[in-house]
Swiss-Prot record:
Keywords: Acetylation, Cholesterol biosynthesis, Cholesterol metabolism, Endoplasmic reticulum, FAD, Flavoprotein, Lipid biosynthesis, Lipid metabolism, Lipoprotein, Membrane, Mitochondrion, Mitochondrion outer membrane, Myristate, NAD, Oxidoreductase, Phosphoprotein, Steroid biosynthesis, Steroid metabolism, Sterol biosynthesis, Sterol metabolism. PANTHER family: NADH-CYTOCHROME B5 REDUCTASE, NADH-CYTOCHROME B5 REDUCTASE 3. FAD binds at R92, P93, Y94, V109, K111, F114, K126, M127, S128, T185. It comes from Mus musculus (Mouse). CDD domains: cyt_b5_reduct_like. Its cofactor is FAD. The gene is Cyb5r3. The lineage of its organism: Eukaryota, Metazoa, Chordata, Craniata, Vertebrata. Belongs to the flavoprotein pyridine nucleotide cytochrome reductase family. This is NADH-cytochrome b5 reductase 3. InterPro entries: CBR-like (IPR001834), Cbr1-like_FAD-bd_dom (IPR008333), FAD-bd_FR_type (IPR017927), Flavoprot_Pyr_Nucl_cyt_Rdtase (IPR001709), FNR_nucleotide-bd (IPR039261), OxRdtase_FAD/NAD-bd (IPR001433), Riboflavin_synthase-like_b-brl (IPR017938).
Length: 301
């Protein structure tokens, strides 16, 4: 009798267990594993590919712990890379250019500041040169997420004044962005998040400043997005040294460029900025104020 009950329970429970197991597998597949589980822990990631984009710009691809992992970086946040160089701990912030939907890898686009190329910085960039010299298979430590802004979708930005503050959520219909050089990476992260959602009607305006046309990072990606989403993404460049037949602006970011290529103050947009501190301090903020954009609607990464 006991054997019969055992057999019967096995027959009854087997389909139930099968359904439960199938459900758990489907659930696990629908929620990918997150790499950056704790912002206070450093995660060593392995370099698996390096692409030369220009003489001084590289795209570095790092493997996540498994092909099923995502990085786990909220839109608007960044990571820190840390390593020891000549016995000293060096830490630098970077924003990935890959999507957080990408599984198994994370991409960083980095401008390499080589030694003896800039008279004010003869030693060059410590971290960028370290990355340049990394070999495939080498590891470096990632830590994050970090940052004071998170894009929640459909025009909603959660912004904190500092790390200890509670976030204030602002909902906008348009976003003005001013980027300089490598400051394009957090902007691209937000732009992609907006444009990949057909139900997000936020309009992004990007004013992108560089020294020369050849210095424009991620130009193919930006122009592809503009061509595919011309109603929701407006793109404008300015360069210090313009080539012949240049169709965009020349010179530092000024009041006229902001008036012509960013949303008006009347639209109550959020203005995002990322670039060299002198550009933010002397070109962006004073001219935004002249145009009428209040400081409380301006955020610097």
């Amino acid at each position: 009798m006991g054997a019969q009950l055992s057999t019967l329970s096995h027959v009854v429970l087997s389909p139930v267990w099968f359904i439960y197991s199938l459900f758990m597998k489907l659930f696990q597949r629908s929620t990918p594993a997150i790499t950056l589980e704790n912002p206070d822990i450093k995660y060593p990631l392995r370099l698996i590919d390096k692409e030369v984009i220009s003489p001084d710009t590289r795209r570095f691809r790092f493997a996540l712990p498994s092909p099923q992992h995502i990085l786990g970086l909220p839109i608007g946040q960044h990571i820190y890379l840390s390593t020891r160089i000549d016995g000293n701990l060096v830490i630098r912030p970077y924003t990935p250019v890959s999507s957080d939907d990408d599984k198994g890898f994370v991409d960083l686009v980095v401008k390499v500041y080589f030694k003896d190329t800039h008279p004010k910085f003869p030693a060059g960039g410590k971290m960028s040169q370290y990355l340049e010299n990394m070999k495939i298979g080498d590891t470096i430590e990632f830590r994050g997420p970090n940052g004071l802004l998170v894009y929640q979708g459909k025009g909603k930005f959660a912004i904190r004044a500092d790390k200890k503050s509670n976030p204030v959520v602002r909902t906008v219909k348009s976003v003005g962005m001013i980027a300089g050089g490598t400051g394009i990476t957090p902007m691209l992260q937000v732009i992609r998040a907006v444009l990949k959602d057909p139900n997000d009607h936020t309009v992004c305006y990007l004013l992108f400043a560089n020294q020369s046309e050849k210095d424009i990072l991620l130009r193919p990606e930006l122009e592809e997005l503009r061509n595919e989403h011309s109603a929701r993404f407006k793109l404008w460049y300015t360069v210090d040294k313009a080539p012949d037949a240049w169709d965009y602006s020349q010179g530092f970011v000024n009041e006229e460029m902001i008036r012509d290529h960013l949303p008006t103050p009347g639209e109550e947009p959020l203005i995002l900025m990322c670039g060299p501190p002198p550009m933010i301090q002397f070109a962006c903020l004073p001219n935004l104020e002249r145009v009428g954009h209040p400081k409380e609607r301006c955020f610097t990464f």
